[in-house]
Amino acid sequence: MAASGEARRVLVYGGRGALGSRCVQAFRARNWWVASIDVVENEEASASVVVKMTDSFTEQADQVTADVGKLLGDQKVDAILCVAGGWAGGNAKSKSLFKNCDMMWKQSMWTSTISSHLATKHLKEGGLLTLAGAKAALDGTPGMIGYGMAKGAVHQLCQSLAGKNSGMPPGAAAIAVLPVTLDTPMNRKSMPEADFSSWTPLEFLVETFHDWITGNKRPNSGSLIQVVTTDGKTELTPAYF
């Protein structure tokens, strides 16, 4: 980890999404160097890697890996925050099952896998990799098959990265955050009648990431951290199996 007061360097995968944009803004405001990785550029970031859309995972993974390599050279980063993702519903009978499963896999597992590989190449010793899981995927998700499968795979990946000989740098931590619902403009628009006091503010996760990057209250590598908000109060609770 960087010395106290030293400017950090962070990659935000999904840096133009609701949470990713907030991470970029908050860490740039602290004068950190922040690069965004997304399908469109984030002009507020120190640098952007634009992901080319393709149906080939290997093509996309190779493109992002190469472009990040050109951007960083031999510079290491303190953290890689994978906050890319999305949501789609549908049970196993749904006409949109295959389309939604494909979309969920691309948004969650492609991004998480690429982020994990980037961590092996560019993360500092003692650095932080965060992945975007989901509390719902700790159990069956019959009404959102594709979403549950993809998030369940993210959880498994996180635990694998914490194991011996995973390829992660010495002392580095892989941690998955498992929220219920994030308080984003898109979610408010799609669920205007919902109880917003049970939704997690984006600022809470941004500050949580800041704590973990700076070594404050960082959970053990492999932790699946449930993020639950009740009556406007958010708590972090590890999931155990």
Swiss-Prot record:
SUPFAM superfamilies: NAD(P)-binding Rossmann-fold domains. The active site is at Y147. PROSITE patterns: ADH_SHORT. Its EC number is 1.5.1.34. NADP(+) binds at residues 11-35. One of its GO terms (molecular function) is 6,7-dihydropteridine reductase activity. CDD domains: DHPR_SDR_c_like. GO terms for cellular component: mitochondrion. The keyword NADP applies. Homodimer. This is Dihydropteridine reductase. The lineage of its organism: Eukaryota, Metazoa, Chordata, Craniata, Vertebrata. The gene is Qdpr.
